[in-house]
Amino acid sequence: MRHRKSGRHLNRTSSHRHAMFKNMCVSLVEHEVIKTTLPKAKELRRHIEPLITLAKQDSVANRRLAFNRTRSKEAVGKLFNELGPRYVERPGGYVRILKCGFRAGDNAPMAYVELVDRPVVEEAAEE
C-alpha cells in the first residue's frame, strides 16, 4: 500500500527523478522561467520553494545545504545574492505556474514555471 507517500513518480526511477529535479531547480534559478510539462511543474514547486526560503537567511550552513541540493556554485550564488534578498518580505509562494497548451508530439499538457516578482526585461524588438 502507498499510504502517506507523497510526490509524483513520473514513470522514473528514484535517482532519475532526483537528478531531473536538481537540474530543473538549477535551470529555474538561472533563467527564472522554464517550460515543462504540467505534472513536472507542480512537483518542481515542492523542490524550489524550500531552496528559496533557505536563501532568505544567508549563512555558510544554508549555502552548504543549498549546494548539496543543487551541486551548482552559480545557482547557489544567485540564490543567496539575488533571489534571497528579493523575497525577504514574501512568506512563500515564490513560483507561478502558467498553463500554455499542449505539446505537439504527444499532446502532453505544458506549463511555464516562473519566479514571481522577477524584473521585466525590455525587449530590443520594440525599437
UniProtKB/Swiss-Prot annotation:
InterPro entries: Ribosomal_bL17 (IPR000456), Ribosomal_bL17_CS (IPR047859), Ribosomal_bL17_sf (IPR036373). GO terms for molecular function: structural constituent of ribosome. Part of the 50S ribosomal subunit. Contacts protein L32. PROSITE patterns: RIBOSOMAL_L17. The keyword Transferase does not apply. It comes from Chromohalobacter salexigens (strain ATCC BAA-138 / DSM 3043 / CIP 106854 / NCIMB 13768 / 1H11). The keyword Ribosomal protein applies. This is Large ribosomal subunit protein bL17. GO terms for cellular component: cytosolic large ribosomal subunit. NCBIfam families: L17.
